[in-house]
Each structure stands twice: as structure tokens, then as C-alpha cells.
Design a protein with these regions (language model features):
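Short, surface-exposed loop or secondary-structure junction motifs
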Residues: 1-143
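Short amphipathic alpha-helix initiation/capping segments at coil-to-helix junctions
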Residues: 79, 124, 128, 152-153, ...
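Short basic/hydrophobic patches in alpha-helices and adjacent helix-turn junctions
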Residues: 95, 137, 150, 161-162
């Protein structure tokens, strides 16, 4: 998976993002600072679906500091990069599949991301969510953009990736100091707000 991503996506886009970081790049990595309240210390009912899910596979927030983690090719959770590289990869989606002359997919494929796959209560996050193909979609409670044709997702610690098809913008926020929230933190949300405030 790492070689495919490097050869077909990151390389052609010039994105400094890796799924399976080569050991030669370790010195460039800024260490993550674990959240004040880590997952094990969150107040979950251990018998709830959220508790059984999140507490059954705890990841020590210091684990990404290890060579084994960095080198592992874990597409859903093990990528290594900076905000610029995450936004660069997502810019291909924001620009209809082609950015700076590099075509990764057709405009029709990009539009398929908006096809709703589910809409309802997420029993782990314990809130309403809508999913398209691989991303969260516009929802009253989760308005990331004033434009309904946007999609997004985030990661443990507070990272955010946002794609807005109407404005052809992508935005990413990644952090070293992890937040304890499961659904994004105020730092990333404030950057999203500032972006849209500046485009009015």
C-alpha cells in the first residue's frame, strides 16, 4: 500500500506524505505529545458500544514514536506527513480529480464521494453523522463549510482534512500536541472558520 500511494499519489503530486515512513526520514519527524486525557482515561461506560469499541483496542499515544509504527503501512491510521502534504493530496479531490496537470481520477469519481452511504446515530461517537464514500458529509451538527458540497474527516488528537468542491479548496490541520476530543478540537475548527471568514 505504501509503495502504491508513493508512486501513484504522493509522488506525482509532490506531497511529502508517507504510508510507511522510510527509516531515513525519521530525523525529520516531530514527536507527538500525548493528550492530557488519553483514551484509557476517558469516561466511557465499559458496557456501552462506545466503551467496548474504544477500550478494546487502546493505542498508546506514544506508540507512533516507534520505528515499528512509523514503518508500518497502516493506511487508516499510520500516515506520516505535515498539513501541507495532507492538503496537497486532498487538493486533487477539491479540483475535480486533476491538480497542476496531474490527473488522479475523473470528476465523476470525485462526485461519488458525495453519495450518501449512511445517515444516523454513530454508536461509537454517540452523535449523528452522515457518510459518503470514505468521508463525513454535511450535517447540521457538523457544519465544516457553508457550502453543502464539502466532505471531511479527522484523526485522533484533533487533525482535520476538509475538501470543498464549490470553492475548490482543501484544508488540513495536523498537530503535535494531541487533544483529548474524539471529534476535532477548537484549534482545527478555528482554522476552518478563519479560512471561510477570509473568503467572504
Amino acid at each position: 500500500m505504501g509503495a502504491f500511494f508513493r508512486d501513484e499519489v504522493a509522488g506525482p503530486l509532490g506531497a511529502d506524505f508517507h504510508i510507511g515512513l522510510p527509516e531515513s526520514e525519521d530525523a525529520r519527524v516531530a514527536e507527538l505529545i500525548p493528550p492530557v486525557i488519553d483514551m484509557a482515561n476517558q469516561e466511557f461506560d465499559p458496557n456501552s458500544i462506545a466503551g467496548r469499541t474504544l477500550l478494546s483496542c487502546l493505542i498508546d499515544a506514544t506508540e507512533p514514536r516507534t520505528r515499528e509504527w512509523r514503518g508500518a503501512e497502516i493506511p487508516a491510521a499510520g500516515g506520516t506527513g505535515n498539513a501541507r502534504s495532507v492538503a496537497r493530496v486532498h487538493s486533487a479531490l477539491a479540483c475535480g480529480g486533476t491538480v497542476d496537470g496531474v490527473r488522479l481520477m475523473s470528476p465523476e469519481t470525485v462526485e461519488r464521494v458525495l453519495e450518501q452511504q449512511s445517515d444516523g446515530q454513530d454508536l461509537v461517537l454517540e452523535l449523528g453523522v452522515r457518510f459518503g464514500m470514505g468521508f463525513g458529509l454535511w450535517l447540521e451538527d457538523w457544519i465544516m463549510s457553508p457550502n453543502p458540497r464539502h466532505f471531511f474527516w479527522g484523526g485522533y488528537g484533533g487533525s482535520i482534512a476538509l475538501v470543498d468542491l464549490d470553492t475548490r479548496m482543501s484544508l488540513a490541520y495536523v498537530m503535535n500536541r494531541m487533544d483529548s476530543e474524539l471529534t476535532g478540537d477548537t484549534r482545527g475548527k478555528s482554522i476552518v472558520k478563519a479560512l471561510y471568514d477570509s473568503t467572504r
